Structure formats: structure tokens, C-alpha cells
UniProtKB/Swiss-Prot annotation:
<keyword id="KW-0547">Nucleotide-binding</keyword>
<dbReference type="GO" id="GO:0004824">
    <property type="term" value="F:lysine-tRNA ligase activity"/>
</dbReference>
<dbReference type="InterPro" id="IPR002313">
    <property type="entry name" value="Lys-tRNA-ligase_II"/>
</dbReference>
<dbReference type="InterPro" id="IPR006195">
    <property type="entry name" value="aa-tRNA-synth_II"/>
</dbReference>
<dbReference type="GO" id="GO:0005524">
    <property type="term" value="F:ATP binding"/>
</dbReference>
<keyword id="KW-0963">Cytoplasm</keyword>
<dbReference type="Pfam" id="PF00152">
    <property type="entry name" value="tRNA-synt_2"/>
</dbReference>
<keyword id="KW-0648">Protein biosynthesis</keyword>
<keyword id="KW-0479">Metal-binding</keyword>
<comment type="subunit">
    <text>Homodimer.</text>
</comment>
<dbReference type="InterPro" id="IPR044136">
    <property type="entry name" value="Lys-tRNA-ligase_II_N"/>
</dbReference>
<keyword id="KW-0436">Ligase</keyword>
<keyword id="KW-0067">ATP-binding</keyword>
<dbReference type="InterPro" id="IPR045864">
    <property type="entry name" value="aa-tRNA-synth_II/BPL/LPL"/>
</dbReference>
<dbReference type="InterPro" id="IPR018149">
    <property type="entry name" value="Lys-tRNA-synth_II_C"/>
</dbReference>
<keyword id="KW-0030">Aminoacyl-tRNA synthetase</keyword>
<dbReference type="GO" id="GO:0000287">
    <property type="term" value="F:magnesium ion binding"/>
</dbReference>
Amino acid sequence: MTEPTQPQAAVAADENQIVAERRDKLRALRDQGIAYPNDFQPTHHAAGLQTEYADADKEALDAKALDVAVAGRMMLKRVMGKASFATVQDGSGQIQFFVTPADVGAETYDAFKKWDLGDIVAARGVLFRTNKGELSVKCTELRLLAKALRPLPDKFHGLADQETRYRQRYVDLIVTPETRATFRARTKAIASIRKFMSDADFMEVETPMLHPIPGGAAAKPFVTHHNALDMQMFLRIAPELYLKRLIVGGFERVFEINRNFRNEGVSPRHNPEFTMMEFYAAYTDYRWLMDFTERLIRQAAVDALGTATIRYQGRELDLAKPFHRLTITQAIQKYAPNYTDGQLSDDAFLRGELKRLGVDVTQPAFLNAGIGALQLALFEETAEAQLWEPTFIVDYPIEVSPLARESDTVAGITERFELFVTGREIANGFSELNDPEDQAARFRKQVEQKDAGDEEAMFFDADYIRALEYGMPPTGGCGIGIDRLVMLLTDSPTIRDVLLFPHLRRED
């Protein structure tokens, strides 16, 4: 039978008592003038020692007599009379300290017995293996570097409340190895992407985060004010138009990994600020982009995880296999096979079906929607969530692709794709529209939609049109959601799990 938990008030009272006791200990350290020393430099890290000497037996280590200096957070402590043990965790892993009064002195040993879990400690000593086979540091010098005033969560239960894990990520990182592994994998994936891009002769650039005109995506921006210039500014929703200005300027391959901001809802797939990579390559098209993106994602998985075969939410996913490619209508008919070609070309039927599925077709975005936009909406309701294996959905309608090049063979269709994996969009790319007159006409259409109430429609960017008028070579461009990619690679069900500090409501 499960024991009843303490009332929250009692837990808070206990924690307050612990904090008060630890403050008393800190006060004593201050009185001695040794509260927060900063003169210790580690020579080794726990993981490095564990790896290098994993196969060394007790006799070999005794013969080597390796001197080490290690520092970290004390996670466990066992005081056993004339010999004590502490498990210390640094940024790489854990190692055991072996402490005796004979080695560190009676005064230091007595002080050590009063130290608390969570304290930052340091030791110099000799690496050895205990009789039970545990690789350890036999401490000859032991110091307290930083006093932890707040207690760590119970080691068996950790941070049980999910929101507390997000809000106090610093504690989550201390006590949850899986969280640390997630963010190490994220770093490896991004490093892999950067190397992949560099090896393909792309130049990494930085473009503005504050825009005078929001553009490059259909989204609602955050608005701010520049006091010195007395002008309204927008946090960027996408870097696209600036990156394509660089293509005009002669940089033929560019990419940027940075934050975008969208003043929209929070969900398992959405955070108001998020990390994207956008890249643009002159003299390429959307077919080249799909091949390139597929290779990039596969390599990121291998570099981050050591394999292209991953597991996500209990299901295996082989990123080494060729990614699927389907048109919007092919995807609908694959996952909702009852729809006929005639129905998918019938405006009234599509509107009725969307309404039946719970879509509000009276909202501004649908008022003048054509067949293509209605098909896309139906795809989102019937097929998108079922695209488990990597799938490029291609040939998006021109009315929802204001920056993409129109197909040379099919009227009303653009050379655009979106990549879906596990039912989520991971990437969006297309052959870029480089005709300034066509682009200006599409911007004007977007302005009409905005005036009709569509808050996500684009503004008219006159300077971008001016840039295109200087001539932009045929170009392909793609954006990859880094956060969603990391969710996939780390088996994380929500975007908050892969953001160090996700957005949350104000704390009460």
C-alpha cells in the first residue's frame, strides 16, 4: 500500500528548516573566511577517469599511483566511523571519494561529516579501486567550495512535478541523467549540422532579430518599439528574406541557426521562441533540397546517437531508409482512401467535409480559399498525424506559398515540400520565387488577406522587392525546426523537453 504523502505545507516547513540549518553552516564558514573559495583547478573529470581506467585492476592502479584533482557536487554520502564515502558528480559523470581522518586530518574529516548533499566539494588524492571494485579517489586533501543552501529532491522520486522540472531546470539537470543526456544529444546534433553545412561549402551568417517588417513566414509577430529611432519593430518570425538578400549579394550558399519568435499558442509542438536552421543555395531547386535535407537529418542522427535507427514513443524508425514522397492528394487518399478524385476537386464538398471535421471554414483564411488551400486543410485533418515514417509532401498550392516558385508544368502548384516525421512537420523548403514582379503581386495579395482579417498574412516588403530587382539566381531554400528534430532524436514527447528554459505561465 502506498504511504500518504506529506501535506504541502508540512513539506515546505521541513524545507525551510533545512535551509535555516544550512544557512547557519554557511555563516560559520563566513566567520572562518572560507565560504566560497575560488582557487581549486581540477586536473581530471569523472567520466574520463571511469573510461580510461575501466579495465585497470586494483594492483595496476596501486602501482600507477595516479594523482588526481576532482571537483563536483556531492550526491551521496556514507559516514562509517573511520572511513567514509561520497559520490561526487561533475559535468561529465560521477566518481567516488574515499575519505579517512588519517588521510585528510581529523579536523577536515569532522567538517566533512557535517557537509550536506548538494554541496560543491573538491579533492586531491590518488586513484585506486576499493575492495568491492569501485573506482575511487583516495582523498589526501578535501575542501568545500560552495555551500548548497537548498536540499536536492529525494533521490528516489526526483522532481515528480513536470512543470517544476521545466521551471527549475537547474535542479532537473542535477538530478535527472536523462535530461542531461537529452541536451548533450541536442548539442551533438547541432554540431553535426554545422559541420555538414560547412562541408557542403555553406557559409554561416547572422541576420537581424529585430525587423522593421515581419516576413518570411505566415505567423503573428511580437511587437516592440525602438526608442532611439522612434519606430515600431518586430521580433523576427523567420530570417528568410534577409538570407535571400545575401544570395542576391553574391553569397551563393548561406545558412543560419538562430531563434525565431511567434506570438502564438503554446503546445507540445510549439513554443513562442524556437530554434530554426534556414539555408539557401543558388542554382538548386526543391528536388535537390529534399535529397540534401534527407542526408543532413540522417547524419545528425548518426552523430548524435551513433545510429540512424531510433525509437520514438515505443516505435522504431529507420532514418537510413529512403524518405517517402507524396503529393497532398496522394497522402489524403493513402490515409483516408474513401475520398475520390472528384470529391477532392469539389469546393463545396471540401468545405462541407472540413466543417464536419470541426474546422471553422468561416475564418478569414478560408473566405477566398481555392481548391488547393482546401485540400491542404483536409490533408492536415486526415493524413498529417499518420505520417510516421519520414515523408516529403510535395506540390503545395500557390495561394499558401507566397514565396515559392510556381511549377512550370502544373498551374497553381509550387515547387515546395514539407517534411513530416512521426506526424510532425520537421522541415519546409522550396524553389525560391526570384521574379520580382510576381513576388510583388503575391505580396499585394497577402496584404488584401491581412486587410480582410487574416493576422498571419504577410506584409509588403518593398526593400526585398528592390533586392530581387537586382537579380537573384535560381535558388532553393529550406528551414528545419531544430527543436522538433531534437524531439525526434531524443524520444521527447513535447518541445519543452528539449528546451532548456521553455516558456511557462508566471509562477504564483
